[in-house]
Amino acid sequence: MSVTMTLGQLAEVLGATLKGPEALQITGLATLQEAGPTQLSFLANPQYRKYLDNSQAGAVLLKAADAESFAGNTLVVADPYLAYARISHLFDPKPKAEAGIHPSAVVAEDAQVDASASIGPFAVIESGARIGANVSIGAHCFIGARCVVGEGGWLAPRVTLYHDVTIGKRVVIQSGAVIGGEGFGFANEKGIWRKIAQIGGVTIGDDVEIGVNTAVDRGALSDTRIGDGVKLDNQIQIAHNVQIGDHTAMAACVGISGSTRIGKHCMLAGGVGLVGHIDICDNVFVSGMTMVTRSITEPGSYSSGTAMQPLADWRKSAARIRHLDDMAKRLQQLEKRVDTVTSGGLPTSEG
């Protein structure tokens, strides 16, 4: 799909101050380094300012301070990255699904599918499911019994919703995601694991995005819950009974153990792991690969582990760890001797 807009139209959409010809046609978006004369770019990160003056972009989204010294066409905005995010949808080449049910789809007689929804090839919609207005269900999706997909939802091909999953409005779910799979629940009887039926469901709020191959398990008793505006990257594991507050975001490969509760407006970087049955308060940032082993009750930034260093240095540090107990004992002995000397006594012989 090809889209063309004028600079004047884009300025109106963004409420931007235009410096340049209103009639200039823009056909797409690109980086400062790669943009051509009919493309729009942006400067959000100062480390890319070095590419600005030589950019061939037809126009650039800039803050007022950067626009003053730039000779090219500009759309002056308060937040160039946010402006880029807003207009990116105008140039999105993703095909638009047509309303209707593909002949190869299997839809239960009592399922409710809005006339404006699109059901792709070989999709399966089971008994009691409800598909809202303007929903797009991709090819080979499975929508289990009694599921609800709210209006404006978009499910990429091969998304699986087990039974009793409720999804809010404008939710995006990428391919391979599995929502409502059975939680990892077992009771041990003399060394033998006995399965616990997972009889809860999953409830997902509005404006949520779930990435490729991410799993959200159903609750053991009550629902696993994902709040409004939550963004989940690819290959994330959300275990049973987890609760995630509104507008929290998680990067790829995060793993959250069962019954953990995460607050609103949190950010978890890639590879973060959380043990089960802990609480994370609102407005917490956790850096990449951190292992969270206890509740966090104060907003702020948290990390664990050691930072990257040259291999030879890391090996030396790792070798010293083996001697920490001995070094601690020797330090205690030295502290005792120092205390004795500074207090006017005589040091005792400790071998």
Swiss-Prot record:
Active site positions: 240
Keyword Repeat (UniProt): yes
Enzyme Commission (EC) number: 2.3.1.191
Catalytic reaction equation(s): a UDP-3-O-[(3R)-3-hydroxyacyl]-alpha-D-glucosamine + a (3R)-hydroxyacyl-[ACP] = a UDP-2-N,3-O-bis[(3R)-3-hydroxyacyl]-alpha-D-glucosamine + holo-[ACP] + H(+)
GO terms of biological process kind: lipid A biosynthetic process
GO cellular component terms, semicolon-separated: membrane
Quaternary data: Homotrimer.
Task of the protein: Catalyzes the N-acylation of UDP-3-O-acylglucosamine using 3-hydroxyacyl-ACP as the acyl donor. Is involved in the biosynthesis of lipid A, a phosphorylated glycolipid that anchors the lipopolysaccharide to the outer membrane of the cell.
Protein name: UDP-3-O-acylglucosamine N-acyltransferase
Organism: Pseudomonas putida (strain ATCC 47054 / DSM 6125 / CFBP 8728 / NCIMB 11950 / KT2440)
Lineage: Bacteria, Pseudomonadati, Pseudomonadota, Gammaproteobacteria, Pseudomonadales
